[in-house]
């Protein structure tokens, strides 16, 4: 049992816990470490000798784990994949726009066109027809009246107690500020694009090693939606990509060998997602909308080499990871008239899952990575749980729209809390 306390240096005590390790694995590793200490020179000899001074089997095993690989190579892909699906969802989310319009009287459409103002009678006729269509008034003017620009953002903080990777846990934050524009395509269709800035961080803690990552990225994509004229159901989707720069610090806390390794890497990510649902009236201007959403996300990180930690520096190979994120849920929203403005509170909940696809493994090498492995690692974890949302949208006269919401996700070994906000402006 590696769940023991280790005095790293005066005043610094760490829990060496990396799980349960067999005595046979430890004995085989010690034999090879002795051989390395006898044949190696320089810093490799110094580190091997210090590790062999760990008389507690648990402390020895945790020391080998700390010096021979990254702290948790699953934490960064998981965080960025959740962020990519969030960015796509925020971009394509249209709330009441994808529902039938409210039945209360509305102002005539804004006057446009080079041929002069439209007559009141024509405007009222057009408005009457559009009351039967989907509720674009709550996200700007009806699409065939013009284009709409928007600025939206999200931010979330997550924590994970991952038991599959050497007993590590990690905290993460990720934000996004994006701007986009969309317009009508065909009958009842919307097509748009966006670009945004995505900062964040991932901090891994476990055993005798910590790893912190600072993330800065640019994301971009296209999205669209389609609603039949009566608004009984809808279809929406998004395709997003991101280029991310990662600055990394790995702190090793082996007694006698306290080191810090730094590195930088780049990653590309892509996400494909779609959602479809029904609009079920519950009286007045209230609707329940059951929906199904599926997202597929792919992550590819380039290789990198650490510096600053002597023989403990790792040369880490490229990494590829993919995941499916299905959700089944429902939203309830109620449109409330306030003069010519519309206030729409909404709530929602869904069952959701994070299903890793393929092998997420990564190869890391240094003088100690070739030792017999101490098997404390597991595969990337499949997550199941639920998500919730609660917010309000305010549609002002002439199409200006604002919204804000709280969003949370509660999954096995992971909790994520955050929010969304945005503004949409017709032009």
Task: Annotate each language-model stretch with its function.
Residues 1-83, 93:
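Extracellular/surface-exposed low-complexity segments
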Residues 52-284, 403-427:
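Outer membrane beta-barrel translocator domains of Type V secretion systems
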Residues 133-134, 139, 153-161, 252-262, ...:
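Gram-negative and organellar
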Residues 149-150, 237-239, 290-294, 345-349:
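Extended hydrophobic secondary-structure segments that form protein cores and membrane-embedded regions
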Residues 240, 276, 280, 288, ...:
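Solvent-exposed flexible segments
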Residues 283-289, 299-303, 338-344:
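Short, structured loop/turn "capping" segments at alpha-beta junctions
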Residues 312-427:
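Outer membrane beta-barrel transmembrane domains
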């Amino acid at each position: 049992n590696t769940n023991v306390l280790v005095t790293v240096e005066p005043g610094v005590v760490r829990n060496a816990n990396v799980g349960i390790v067999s005595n046979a694995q430890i004995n085989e590793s010690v034999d090879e470490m002795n051989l390395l200490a006898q044949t190696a020179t320089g810093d490799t000899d110094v580190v091997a000798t210090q590790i062999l001074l760990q008389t507690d089997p648990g402390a020895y095993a945790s020391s080998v784990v700390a010096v021979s690989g990254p702290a948790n190579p699953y934490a960064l892909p998981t965080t960025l994949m959740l962020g990519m699906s969030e960015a796509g969802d925020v971009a394509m989310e249209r709330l009441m726009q994808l529902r039938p319009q409210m039945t209360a009287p509305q102002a005539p459409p804004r006057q446009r066109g080079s041929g002069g103002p439209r007559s009141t009678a024509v405007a009222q006729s057009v408005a009457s027809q559009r009351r039967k269509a989907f509720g674009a008034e709550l996200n700007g003017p009806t699409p065939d009246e013009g284009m709409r620009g928007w600025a939206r953002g999200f931010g979330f903080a997550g924590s994970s107690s991952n038991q599959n990777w050497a007993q590590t846990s990690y905290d993460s934050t990720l934000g996004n500020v994006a701007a986009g524009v969309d317009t009508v395509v065909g009958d009842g269709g919307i097509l748009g694009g966006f670009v945004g800035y995505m900062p964040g961080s991932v901090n891994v803690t476990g055993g005798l090693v910590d790893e912190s990552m600072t993330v800065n990225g640019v994301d971009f994509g296209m999205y669209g939606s389609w609603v039949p004229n009566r608004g009984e159901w809808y279809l929406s989707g998004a395709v997003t990509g991101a280029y991310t720069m990662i600055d990394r610090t790995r702190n090793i806390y082996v007694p006698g060998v306290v080191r810090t390794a730094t590195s930088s890497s780049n990653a590309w990510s892509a996400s494909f997602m779609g959602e479809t649902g029904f609009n079920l009236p519950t009286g007045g201007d209230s609707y329940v909308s059951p929906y199904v959403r599926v997202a597929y996300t792919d992550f590819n990180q380039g290789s990198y080499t650490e510096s600053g930690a002597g023989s403990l520096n790792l040369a880490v190979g490229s990494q590829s990871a993919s995941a499916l994120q299905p959700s089944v849920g429902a939203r309830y929203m109620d449109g409330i008239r306030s003069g010519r403005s519309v206030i729409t509170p909404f709530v929602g909940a869904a069952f959701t899952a994070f299903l890793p696809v393929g092998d997420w493994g990564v190869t890391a090498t240094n003088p100690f990575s070739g030792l017999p492995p101490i098997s404390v690692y597991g595969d990337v974890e499949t997550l199941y749980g639920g998500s919730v949302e609660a917010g309000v949208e305010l549609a002002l006269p002439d199409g200006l729209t604002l919204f804000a919401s709280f969003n949370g996700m509660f999954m096995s070994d992971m909790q994520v809390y955050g929010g969304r906000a945005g503004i949409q402006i017709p032009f």
